[in-house]
């Protein structure tokens, strides 16, 4: 699994950025930390509909029931958003993912105000897809 910051650290790092250009660069840097997605996982079953860019997300439980997320995108900023989402869900079980509303976290970053409408819709599609994957594992 990629080395992603805990949500509190991510929020602190985000707040330390001086402007939105730095924040976007930080998001892109987070995306670069994601492990490469195997080609066999880049298939229609793992493709997230509702995203303007191509986004693939795979959710698998480990031996302890913790959901391990894998993902990629053909767009750097979207790949970074995947990493932000994954940092919020890392270490959680399927039940915890289904019950967790991460939208307040994104609101606290004011991220939706600075994303294009299509990226905001794509972010929402990613959140729905991860929760649906988790719910299917219950």
From Swiss-Prot:
Domain of life: Bacteria
Any one biological process term the GO annotation gives: iron-sulfur cluster assembly
Active site positions, chain numbering: 51
Cellular compartments annotated: Cytoplasm
Coiled coil residues, start to end: none
Pathway recorded for this protein: Cofactor biosynthesis; iron-sulfur cluster biosynthesis
Pfam families: SufE
SUPFAM superfamilies (UniProt xref): SufE/NifU
Disulfide bonds: none
GO cellular component entries: cytoplasm
Protein keywords: Cytoplasm
Function: Participates in cysteine desulfuration mediated by SufS. Cysteine desulfuration mobilizes sulfur from L-cysteine to yield L-alanine and constitutes an essential step in sulfur metabolism for biosynthesis of a variety of sulfur-containing biomolecules. Functions as a sulfur acceptor for SufS, by mediating the direct transfer of the sulfur atom from the S-sulfanylcysteine of SufS, an intermediate product of cysteine desulfuration process.
Family the entry assigns: Belongs to the SufE family.
Stored HAMAP family: SufE
Quaternary data: Homodimer. Interacts with SufS.
Stated name of the protein: Cysteine desulfuration protein SufE
């Amino acid at each position: 699994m990629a080395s992603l910051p805990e949500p509190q650290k991510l929020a602190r790092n985000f707040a330390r950025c001086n402007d939105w250009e730095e924040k976007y660069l930080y998001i892109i840097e987070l995306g670069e930390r994601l492990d490469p997605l195997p080609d066999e996982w880049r298939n229609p079953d793992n493709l997230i509909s509702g995203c303007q860019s191509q986004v693939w997300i795979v959710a698998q439980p480990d031996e302890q029931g913790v959901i391990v997320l894998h993902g990629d995108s053909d767009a750097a900023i979207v790949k970074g958003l995947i990493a932000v989402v994954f940092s919020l869900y890392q270490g959680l079980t399927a039940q915890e993912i289904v019950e967790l509303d991460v939208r307040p976290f994104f609101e606290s970053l004011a991220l939706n105000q600075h994303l294009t409408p299509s990226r905001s819709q794509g972010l929402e599609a990613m959140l729905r897809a991860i929760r649906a994957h988790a719910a299917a594992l219950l």
